[in-house]
Amino acid sequence: LLDAIKNYAPDAKFYQASTSEMFGNNWEEDETQNELTAFRPRSPYATSKVFAHHNVVMYRESYGIQGSCGILFNHESPIRGLEFVTRKITDAVARIHFGLQDSIELGNLEARRDWGFAGDYVKVMWKMLQQDTADDYVIATGQTRSIIAFLDRAFAHVGINSWEKYVVQNPEFMRPAEVPHLRGNPAK
């Protein structure tokens, strides 16, 4: 696709959806990741995203294509798939509340993520493509919350103040190389 833009549509603008998972374990307590933070991917998914990100940067710098990379931190919406922890939790909490389910199995409860609303992030993507010069941008809120905090709020929303009896930690859901903390710096 990048080669086609270079050869046949050099004025086209291209958006690459990169991911905060590219940063991996590259963090210190109370620090944020920005466009200059080194990548240390810890999964095949993150590694493939680093490859795609670097390809866009290379085509932009070498051939002048208008390719921008949005380094997206976790973005959520009501249509997010149930395979993602936030939707898994909200779906299970509703089912538990209505007596349709007894518990929920989760992996690492200590993981911290920078969660934002997908609709807001799409607006930022569009604004990126309106710029005169292509560049890379972190798309994030700058705040993190743990899975535990997410559980607290989700269960409290349905009037359950103690979620611990409903949550089972299952080693099967633990990632082999967990990224414990991601917080973006959206200042750019």
Task: Give names to the regions the model predicted.
Residues L1-A4, R153:
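Short, conserved SAM-binding segment of the class I
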Residues V85-K188:
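C-terminal substrate-binding subdomain of Rossmann-fold SDR/epimerase-dehydratase oxidoreductases
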Residues D3, N7-Q16, E21-I71, E76-R80:
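Catalytic helix-loop patch of NAD(P)-dependent Rossmann-fold dehydrogenases
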